[in-house]
Amino acid sequence: MEPSAEDGGATSSSRAEKGEPPRDPVEQARAICLRLLTGTPRTRRQLAEALRKREIPEEAAEEVLSRFEEVGLINDGAFAQAWVESRHHGRGLARRALARELRTKGVEAALIDVAVSQLDTEQEEETARDLVARKLRATRGLDRDKRLRRLAGMLARKGYSEGMALRVVRQALEEEGEDTEHLGDEGF
């Protein structure tokens, strides 16, 4: 393309190449969504909020979001399943914590239930044991009750139930030779 007086002598007249935002609200919404989806998957609600913050008209936002869902660029179910897989294996989060995170991201309850059902109680307990085993050494030298509170508290913050947390921590302490017979069930 030849430079012209209209485009200031630039060799390109594409707004995208000049870094200018498109003027049409639908094009603006499409560009914003594509840019956000490039870095990481996002939920429909996250994208809708981003468009709302950028003052994209609701009709244009809805049109783009619906089209992106049709072609599979937005898929809250797949997002939820990938999130559960990643956060459980990467951070050791339990079903309860994962469900809470997905709710804050705007995933529907039915999709959350399907995603967290990937994890069964045995997997959760095995992950809890691994987490406790990694932290156990750092608590050596502390009294038994303090160790129990710290380790069970760590599991609770990751979404594990009180019962499972106490059971897993007791087992780990027993395997280490701690006397856990008189540890109360009053919580941590």
UniProtKB/Swiss-Prot annotation:
Biased composition (Basic and acidic residues): 15-27
Protein name per Swiss-Prot or TrEMBL: Regulatory protein RecX
Location relative to the cell: Cytoplasm
Keywords, comma-separated and alphabetical: Cytoplasm
Main location, first listed in the record: cytoplasm
Homology family: Belongs to the RecX family.
One GO biological process term: regulation of DNA repair
Region (Disordered), start-end ranges: 1-28
Gene Ontology cellular component annotations, sorted alphabetically: cytoplasm
Keyword match Iron: no
InterPro entries according to UniProt: RecX_HTH_1st, RecX_HTH_2nd, RecX_HTH_3rd, Regulatory_RecX, WH-like_DNA-bd_sf
Keyword Isomerase: no
Protein task: Modulates RecA activity.
